[in-house]
Amino acid sequence: MFYDYADSGSWTESTYRSNESDFQKIKLRQRVAVNMTNRTLETTMVGEKVTMPVALAPTGLTGMQHADGEILAAKAAEKFGVPFCLSTMSICSIEDVAERTTKPFWFQLYVMKDRGFIERLIERAKAACLLYTSDAADE
């Protein structure tokens, strides 16, 4: 079950197959003998300086692959100077990730019917950035 979760797509896997096909079409153009001295990938994202315009996206149940999966991902993002976003469906708690990192992280919010739970979750998150997920059915 864990392998299928990590290495497949949902339902008919049509999006998974489409993404795989699209990635195969990407061709990187190699450039050699170019002076790279003054080039940088540094930029800002939601007002914060980052080393490159990349963020570690929220991945639900990362802890199924490794008990401290979200913590390790957050620490790696911090080490390399890019944002980390914790999923509502993470195995590690907001508090556990915050305790083991020094920078604020983003939090992906799935809005559910229990508004009290959502309000408490937002209060716990106190993230630098709150990402609202609108692709999930309201159960």
Please tell me what each predicted stretch does.
Residues 1-48:
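An N-cap/entry alpha-helix motif that binds or orients negatively charged groups
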Residues 54-57, 84-86, 105-109:
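Hydrophobic faces of well-ordered beta-strands that scaffold small-molecule active sites
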Residues 56, 77, 135:
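Conserved, mostly hydrophobic/aromatic
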Residues 65-72, 114-120:
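Glycine-rich anion/phosphate-binding loops
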Residues 87-101, 115-120:
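Active-site-adjacent beta->alpha loops and helix N-cap segments on the catalytic face
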Residues 116-131:
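Internal gly/pro-rich beta-alpha loop/helix module
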Residues 132-139:
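Conserved small/polar residues in nucleotide/adenosyl-binding loops
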